[in-house]
Curated annotation (Swiss-Prot):
Residues 1-21 form a transit peptide. This is Putative redox protein FMP46, mitochondrial. GO terms for cellular component: mitochondrion. Keywords: Mitochondrion, Oxidoreductase, Transit peptide. PANTHER family: REDOX PROTEIN FMP46, MITOCHONDRIAL-RELATED. Its EC number is 1.-.-.-. It comes from the Eukaryota. Putative mitochondrial redox protein which could be involved in the reduction of small toxic molecules. It comes from Kluyveromyces lactis (strain ATCC 8585 / CBS 2359 / DSM 70799 / NBRC 1267 / NRRL Y-1140 / WM37) (Yeast).
Length: 129
């Protein structure tokens, strides 16, 4: 099998950034993601703040939705990639106001879509899979 075909059959990765996996918003998103049987996906749970490069990419995808989750996006994009916030535990980011504790963030890197609610998942992602 060619390399292209091998990659083609790999499940897509959807990342769920959450500071508290047992929270209702994270569990609701996980349930919605797992109920999608149309395509095989790997759900990656991430409890660390995105890297500077990831944050820049996410802002290009959908800055308004990203700012619902990361209210300080604009000022954070001006920080150096080495800033200790990037890659730090999300619980610490909740405490310093860099992460919205009321929601979680889902990202489909391949399809370049993101959101913070089950509704956004249904509107932006589920019908297009």
């Amino acid at each position: 099998m060619s390399m292209f075909k091998t990659i083609q059959f790999q499940p897509r990765v959807v990342t769920l950034f959450t500071h508290k996996l047992e929270s209702s918003h994270a569990q609701n998103l996980l349930t919605a993601l797992k109920s999608n049987h149309k395509n095989k996906i790997n759900i990656e749970i991430c409890q660390k703040f995105p890297t500077r490069d990831q944050l820049e990419y996410l802002a290009k995808i959908d800055k308004p939705d990203l700012m619902e989750q990361i209210p300080k996006t604009e000022s954070l994009l001006k920080k150096a990639a080495e800033d200790p916030l990037f890659g730090s535990p999300l619980q610490k980011c909740v405490e310093n106001g860099s992460w919205n504790k009321q929601t979680s963030l889902w990202v489909d890197w391949e399809k370049a879509v993101l959101g913070t609610t089950v509704q956004s998942l249904k509107e932006k992602w589920l019908p297009k899979n």
